[in-house]
Amino acid sequence: NEYNDLNQIVKSTNALKYVSTYEYDKYGNKTKETYEEHETVNKYDVNSQLIKKTENKDKVTTYSYDALGREVSQKQNDKEIISKKYDAVSNVVEKTEKGLTTQYRYDALKHPVQYLYPSLEDGSMKAIVSVDYDEEGNAVQYKDIYDHVIKREYDANSNMIAETNSNGFITRYQYDSLNNMTKVQSPLERVMKYDYDGNNNLVERSYNDKKATYEYDEADNLIKEVSEYGLTETYQYDDFGQMTSYTKNDGTTIDYSYDALGRKLSEGTRQFKYDAYDNLLEADYNNKSVKYTYDKFNNITKVKDANDNNVAYKWDIYGNKTEIKYNDYTISYTYNQFDKIDKVSKNGKEYASYSYDVRGNTKSLERNGITTDYSYDELNRRTAYVNTKGDKTLSEYKYEYDGQ
């Protein structure tokens, strides 16, 4: 590594000779970082808060703050990704991320006691989940909008020792002095037990008369496991904790090798190659290769198989896949402002279109002249869907859930 007069790192070279460089402003803020052909440029305000990040010249993320230095919005290429609102004690009381708004209510100890979401009926904000806490800050009760209640009990170390679901069924838990879970008893009295060694590694798991065992080396790497059915598997590792050998119950052994950055170079007879950004470039097996190409944002752009078949991909600046092309067959995707698929086309002809509710659930899907309409309850559980063609109902399905 190389440093400037202020002892700030300005150049680093990793084990494979890939080079990173760094630049700083007079306040010590990192203003530029390069790694091989990738570049990130940062801009700060007078309070040294990051206000703009430009990646590879095209991907621009901007950040806004309130007078107290709290982040209130984040935009990517002028599209708002996240916005936040706070109360007087800096609790986030509202967060909107990709169009979905969630509001939070807190108690005097800053525990979130209510989670509010847009109602699927009228769009108004409703408390979908409410939470109660004990004096130690453990969540002891969850209650949803339909009055379904989950209750929890804890020991002195805040380990959950019992959970009662909305139907009254109880699951119980026990722990050792190091807070490792040693026993789980289901509502049907089924019991799972766990034992640990002095390093908190699981060495035995038992259920009724069946038992699985585990052994470890001095570095706490798992080296042997015997399943409940007597199947044995063993493992070996290098000095970096990377698995170098795996032996199956039938005696078959698979060996592994790695490069200086810890990336897998081989797995049995399979071979792998990577670029500087850890993207898989090539996978070889039995003298056949699959090759991969990427754009400057590490999105895969082409796959070429051993028979010279090519699949090409395109992406927008937000990381959404916009096109897949295979031979003369092209599938195109468009997205709404919240990065959800809006339309799908095949060879230029619209194939499917989607609409969404205020929660981001798929509300309808139109494909090949058939429309599927979906309904959900306030817990985002699907309650029904109907397939129609014109004015004719083709099929209808409804769902019911425990506790309703």
Predicted regions and their residues:
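Beta-strand elements of repeat-based all-beta scaffolds
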Residues: 1-14, 18-55, 59-144, 148-165, ...
